């Protein structure tokens, strides 16, 4: 579902402190520093907000503003550049 929504073949999704990969090898994911930084930011967000509260906030943001303008995604994209 995430791959279709993002129009991407390869997807990484964080739940708690685990990064779940779809159609990408662990090696290729780890070699992409921007993608890794993005997902590590989501791990930090889960830690800061708590597991269930983060999911609720993330879903609410996505419903209100869409995926691209979701503040958690904006923050994760900014983390890619650090």
What function would you assign to each model-found segment?
Residues 1-21, 49-82:
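Metalloprotease/metallohydrolase-associated module, dominated by Zn2+-dependent proteases
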Residues 11-12, 18-36:
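Short pre-active-site segment immediately N-terminal to the catalytic Zn-binding motif
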Residues 30, 37-39, 59-61:
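Generic alpha-helical propensity signal that fires on short helical segments
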Residues 34-46, 76:
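Active-site recognition of the HExxH zinc-binding catalytic motif
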């Amino acid at each position: 579902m995430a791959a279709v929504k993002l129009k991407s073949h390869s997807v990484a999704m964080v739940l708690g402190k685990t990064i779940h990969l779809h159609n990408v090898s662990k090696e290729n994911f780890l070699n992409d520093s921007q993608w890794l930084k993005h997902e590590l930011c989501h791990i930090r967000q889960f830690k800061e907000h708590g597991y269930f509260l983060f999911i609720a906030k993330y879903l609410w943001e996505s419903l209100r503003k869409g995926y691209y303008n979701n503040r958690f995604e904006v923050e994760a994209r900014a983390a890619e550049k650090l």
